[in-house]
């Protein structure tokens, strides 16, 4: 049985196990059916620990759409989402190593890592995400820390299976030894490792990151429904939001700030924090739009906007509007978890973010307009498919 796309797992990278997400799967016995991620049912997206269960009347979908973002806040870019075949082998991924063509493989994204580390791995490097394997993950990390403290390189560690007998494999038809030639060195990039104190520091930083918890933003049901509508308009109906929006992200943030700052004394610490939060939302939006907030069908429009002389001096928050801004709040919990903010700062930020979400909900009829979406032209559809 091949693990489902968008499911979480543990994957070996070097001698350690890392939490990962399966973006694509490849099964040589079912070529053509499991080799790529489809845009059909959208993956469930968590907003902190809130999972949307809203159901649209015109369809059975009950999940919040992933606006190019994964539940843990990581990006799954075109390479992850679009299947490119090898020359002469239409059912084989282009970047799959030749020696792996006859076995089940998964294209994984390691949680908290940049997309450049996404890779195809053999089924023997993938474990189910369960208590036994999480225990194994901790044992491997402890062994690596001990080796690093003694000045040993990670490569000097025993093979992973020698450290524990508790590993529970992902359900597959066959399993090979972790000591095989296809283990950690597999993939298009060499595994980067550091030994001694540097390795110890890396592990300790990673351990700190894993201890952080994503904040749980309270998002009104009608905004969750708005996200589902947005997903369906773009991915199913092949519609685009007309750009530039009449009311942009910058305009919305200004209106929110004007309304919110009435509660604070000018020049007070609270007023300063509000200014920082508003500036931060704008910054996050501008930096993340092109990488995690767009559906694949919208990328051609984004390229046209960024290459247009009319918008060369504008930021994306001066072009896009509420539709794309709302998508940011799906990814924000994961993005915030990757910062170094202390618990008190996160709590203050959470309060302001939820104020802003309530503001969007209150003004939903003003900012979210169905007529903002228009059908894409046949020429655009051809360009979006690379024709």
UniProtKB/Swiss-Prot annotation:
One of the protein's GO biological processes: chromatin remodeling
Comp. bias (Basic and acidic residues): 76-92
Oligomer and partners: Component of the NuA4 histone acetyltransferase complex.
Keyword field: Chromatin regulator, DNA damage, DNA repair, Nucleus, Transcription, Transcription regulation
Stated role: Involved in deacetylation of histones, chromatin assembly and chromosome segregation. May act as a transcriptional oscillator, directing histone deacetylases to specific chromosomal domains. Component of the NuA4 histone acetyltransferase complex which is involved in transcriptional activation of selected genes principally by acetylation of nucleosomal histone H4 and H2A. The NuA4 complex is also involved in DNA repair.
Record region (Disordered): 52-96, 159-197
One Pfam family of this chain: MSL3_chromo-like
Cell location: Nucleus
Coiled-coil zones: none
Name of protein: Chromatin modification-related protein EAF3
PANTHER family per the UniProt record, alphabetical: MORTALITY FACTOR 4-LIKE PROTEIN, MSL COMPLEX SUBUNIT 3
UniProt KW Acetylation keyword: no
Gene3D superfamilies: 2.30.30.140, MRG domain
Family of this protein: Belongs to the MRG family.
Record's GO cellular component terms: NuA4 histone acetyltransferase complex; Rpd3S complex
Residue ranges of domain Tudor-knot in the record: 100-126
Residue ranges annotated for the MRG domain, each copy included: 211-385
Metal-binding in keyword set: no
UniProt organism field: Yarrowia lipolytica (strain CLIB 122 / E 150) (Yeast)
């Amino acid at each position: 049985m091949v693990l489902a796309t968008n499911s979480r797992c543990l994957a070996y990278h070097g001698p350690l196990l890392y939490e990962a997400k399966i973006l694509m799967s490849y099964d040589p016995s079912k070529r053509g059916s499991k080799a790529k991620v489809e845009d059909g049912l959208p993956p469930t997206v968590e907003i902190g620990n809130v999972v949307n269960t809203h159901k649209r009347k015109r369809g059975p979908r009950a999940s919040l759409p992933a606006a190019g973002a994964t539940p843990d806040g990581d990006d799954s870019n075109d390479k992850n989402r679009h299947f490119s075949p090898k020359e002469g082998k239409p059912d084989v991924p282009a970047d799959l190593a030749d020696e792996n063509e006859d076995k089940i493989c998964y294209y994984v994204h390691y949680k908290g890592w940049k997309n450049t580390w996404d890779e195809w791995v053999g089924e023997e490097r993938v474990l189910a995400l369960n208590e036994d394997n999480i225990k194994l993950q901790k044992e491997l990390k402890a062994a690596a820390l001990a080796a690093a403290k003694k000045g040993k390189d990670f490569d000097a560690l025993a093979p992973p299976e020698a450290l524990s007998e508790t590993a529970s494999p992902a359900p597959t038809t066959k399993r090979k030894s972790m000591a095989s030639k296809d283990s950690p060195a597999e993939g298009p990039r060499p595994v980067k490792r550091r030994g001694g104190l540097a390795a110890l520091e890396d592990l300790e930083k990673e351990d700190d990151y894993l201890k952080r918890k994503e904040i749980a933003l309270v998002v009104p049901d009608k905004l969750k429904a708005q996200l589902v509508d947005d997903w369906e308009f773009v991915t199913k109906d092949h519609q685009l939001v007309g750009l530039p929006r009449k009311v942009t992200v910058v305009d919305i943030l200004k209106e929110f700030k004007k309304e919110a700052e009435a509660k604070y004394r000018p020049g007070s610490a609270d007023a300063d924090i509000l200014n920082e939060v508003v500036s931060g939302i704008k910054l996050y939006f501008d930096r993340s739009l092109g990488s995690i907030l767009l559906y694949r069908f919208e990328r051609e429009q984004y390229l046209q906007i960024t290459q247009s002389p009319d918008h060369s001096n504008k930021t994306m928050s001066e072009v896009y509007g509420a539709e794309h801004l709302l998508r940011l709040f799906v990814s924000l919990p994961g993005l915030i978890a990757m910062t170094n903010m202390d618990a008190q700062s996160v709590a203050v930020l959470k309060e302001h973010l939820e104020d802003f979400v309530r503001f969007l909900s209150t003004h939903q009829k003003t900012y979210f307009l169905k007529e903002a979406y228009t059908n894409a032209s046949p020429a655009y559809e051809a360009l979006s498919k690379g024709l």
